[in-house]
Design a protein with these regions (language model features):
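Pore- and pathway-forming membrane helices of multi-pass small-molecule/ion transporters and channels
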Residues: 9-18, 33-74, 84-89, 106-173, ...
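Short, amphipathic, aromatic/basic-enriched membrane-interface segments that mark the entry/exit
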Residues: 10-32, 48-51, 72-81, 96-103, ...
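Alpha-helical transmembrane segments of multi-pass membrane proteins
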Residues: 61-62, 354-366, 376-387, 402-414, ...
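C-terminal functional regions that serve as terminal interaction/effector modules
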Residues: 418-419, 423-430, 434-438, 446-474, ...
Length: 683
């Protein structure tokens, strides 16, 4: 701890980031890592045995192809086969008509690249077109490097083998021999979330970060999509299982902030918590066996009173409604998403994005050809790989690519100097490569925030030490050239994406926040009663809120990297946005607490009171895009004596008023805390 205290704050944050990423535990990560690790070793063995060139490309196919579950791996494998056909076909067309004419070759390759980049952003199968763009650029240096067309044709045909045999290998490993099923991962993930919920229910624990809660909720939704596509039983009972996922997400996220020491430990409350934990355990056992859980628990009047006293009545009712739901309830028909985005041919940003990528590639190709430096051809690949929809995400990808390339180059240098002279056979080579590939595979299976580092590290290492050589290599020039090529491509891309039609998210961020607050206002308009339809709607919108707040958080991180913006305006926008996100999360949890007390009131009274909060929030959200939003000041209406609300509910709603008043004032020149207290609220 003392050593960390002496380090600069950015270094400490970087170390904390890598610690979080490397220690991440999610269902399916270990099997995916092992599959990727074994696949890499088999690729090296096969390529060295049969002298197949482009080892780095084969490894890249594995790293992009092996996914967290068998269904996703099979789907990506099919896409890779289609992409390989398109890639090689486009290359042969380019070579046929322009082999000896670099200018004509670029004229033909340019529209292909632009079309692929355009479709990558607008089509559902963008991964296919991304692969075609990569190969179209990767094959441009071949005619300049080789004077014999026959050799170029052979190398191009080898690309078919290089792309397809790793695809076959990952299908055998990840789909046929050692499949990791999505349904198994879902059962494990649901039980892990319920374990965390029980721990917070029975013990006073520090709440987990809200970003982690939201990522876990999104992970469950992604697994649900794979289960629907991969498991027939899940599809048959999909309505129950989707309700189960929503219920578990709600219990997990709500109990994360629950503190049992905040309530009196009466015997009735203790017994009720034990009963609730017992029911959750029964749900866990049913999930582990793949069965739809049915509960015969009927809450008594004393248990209902204890649940209300310790703010657990809503969780209890939500759990019981799941236990009493018919497993054969017909699912809601799913709407098929369109293959293209709605504004594909009306939004100029997509075509500008393709033009920017082409411009960056042409600049790198001109420099590469002008200096006659074959080793830096990775600069053109870099321009395609780091091309992202906006400036912030492009900078993130550049940092990941540079970091991975740097680590890979260092490992390649150490490997060439210290290890390569002592190797005599393929077995020794595999033993030495095993820990490097294992490290790269573990990093590559982390979250999207850092996974590309592992892929780039292994590919850079292979390019420098294993590419097109089938014996010991001691050439340090390869290491230098690959790293410099990546640096040149990164610099050119940074300049182009920053100053040529920069796609900033600074204007989109307030709109994104307004959308999240709009969903929160919809939650407030749902009647706070234990009615089946209302509760299911509430749970589904709540999951959407987790996704919305997480998307806003990630957008804030990207906007922070947009250095073309004025520094003060950028800092003010980020500070205000983070305050809105933080207060929005707090308002959501505070509104949850009002459900327990509001259930005891007459239905006719609640919509009027809830409508005050929803109207104020919608008005605030409507002004975010134009920076005209002021901190809402809510005056709670007095109720007639015959409809007097519970003191607990009044106190909870006053707390919501206080949270509303802490929303930032976007009309002020600088972000200052609210000085006026919300009317009707107490400190």
């Amino acid at each position: 701890m003392s050593a960390l205290n002496s380090l600069p704050l950015p270094v400490v944050r970087l170390l904390a980031f890598f610690h979080e990423e490397l220690s991440e535990r999610r269902p399916g990560r270990v099997p995916q890592t092992v599959q990727l690790w074994v696949g890499c070793l088999l690729v090296i063995l096969i390529s060295m045995t049969f002298e197949i060139p482009f080892v780095a490309l084969s490894l890249a196919v594995l790293f992009y192809g092996i996914q967290s579950n068998a269904f996703y791996t099979k789907f990506v494998a099919i896409l890779f086969v289609v992409a390989t056909v398109l890639e090689i076909g486009s290359l042969f067309l380019i070579y046929k008509w322009s082999y000896g004419e670099p200018l004509i070759r670029l004229i033909i390759a340019g529209p292909i690249l632009m079309g692929c980049m355009f479709l990558m952003r607008t089509h559902r199968l963008g991964l296919v077109f991304f692969a075609v763009a990569i190969v179209a650029i990767y094959g441009q240096p071949f005619p300049a490097m080789l004077d014999y067309p026959e050799v170029v044709v052979r190398l191009t045909l080898w690309c078919i083998v290089v792309g397809l045999y790793p695809t076959l290998l990952m299908t055998l490993i990840g789909v046929l021999w050692f499949p990791s099923r999505a349904i198994t991962q879902m059962h494990q993930a649901l039980n892990d979330r319920l374990d965390d919920a029980i721990s917070h229910l029975t013990n006073s624990l520090t709440p987990l970060p809200e970003t982690r809660i939201e990522r876990e909720a999104l992970a469950l939704q992604k697994l649900n999509v794979f289960c629907l596509a991969d498991d027939a039983n899940w599809r048959t009972q999909s309505a129950w299982w989707q309700s189960c996922v929503a219920t578990v997400t709600y219990i997990y996220s709500t109990l994360n902030r629950y503190d049992p020491t905040s309530f009196a430990d009466s015997q009735a409350i203790i017994e009720f918590r034990q009963k609730l934990a017992s029911e959750i355990n029964k749900l866990q056992h049913a999930i582990a066996e793949g069965q739809c859980w049915q509960s015969d628990w009927r809450i008594t009047e004393s248990e209902a009173m204890a649940a209300r006293e310790c703010n657990l009545e809503n969780i209890c009712q939500t759990l019981l409604q799941l236990g009493q739901m018919d497993p054969n309830t017909p699912p809601t028909p799913a709407t098929k998403p369109p293959s293209m985005v709605a504004d594909a041919f009306t939004n100029p940003d997509y075509m500008r994005y393709a033009v920017k990528t082409l411009l960056a590639c042409l600049i790198c190709y001109t420099f590469y050809s002008g200096v006659d430096w074959e080793g830096i051809h990775t600069c053109m690949l870099t321009c395609v790989i780091v091309a992202n929809p906006n400036v912030g995400s492009s900078y993130q990808k550049m940092a990941l690519r540079f970091g991975g390339a740097f680590c890979g180059a260092i490992l390649a240098l150490l490997f060439t100097l210290l290890v390569m002279p002592w190797l005599d056979n393929i077995v020794e080579l595999l033993f030495v490569l095993a820990p490097i590939f294992l490290l790269g595979a573990w990093i590559a299976t982390s979250s999207e925030r850092s996974s590309y580092i592992g892929t780039q590290m292994v590919v850079t290492f292979a390019l420098a030490t294993l590419e097109n050589v089938f014996g010991p290599v001691y050439d340090l020039v390869e290491i230098r050239d690959r790293a410099l090529g990546i640096i040149i491509g990164t610099v050119v891309s940074a300049v182009i994406y920053t100053f040529v039609w920069p796609e900033s998210e600074a204007r989109t961020l307030p709109q994104k926040l307004a959308g999240a607050l709009g969903m929160l206002s919809k939650v407030m308009r749902i009647p706070r009663q234990q009615e089946v339809t209302a509760l299911r709607t509430y749970l589904q919108i709540r999951i959407g809120l987790h996704a919305a707040f997480n998307a806003c958080e990630e957008m804030c991180q990207r906007v922070a990297l947009e250095r073309q913006l004025d520094s003060e305006e950028r800092a003010l926008l980020i500070e205000r946005s983070q305050t809105v996100i933080r207060q929005g999360r707090d308002i959501l949890h505070a509104w949850d607490a009002t459900w327990n007390s509001a259930q005891a009131l007459d239905n006719a009274l609640q919509p009027d009171r809830a409508g005050q909060f929803a109207d104020a929030l919608e008005k605030y959200a409507a002004g975010l895009a134009t920076a005209l939003s002021r901190s809402p000041q809510i005056t709670l209406e007095e109720t007639p004596a015959s409809q007097a609300i519970l003191p607990t509910l009044l106190k909870q709603e006053q707390h919501v008023c206080q949270l509303f008043a802490r929303l930032p004032d976007w009309t002020a020149p600088a972000l200052t805390p609210a000085t006026e207290q919300a009317q009707g609220a107490t400190q």
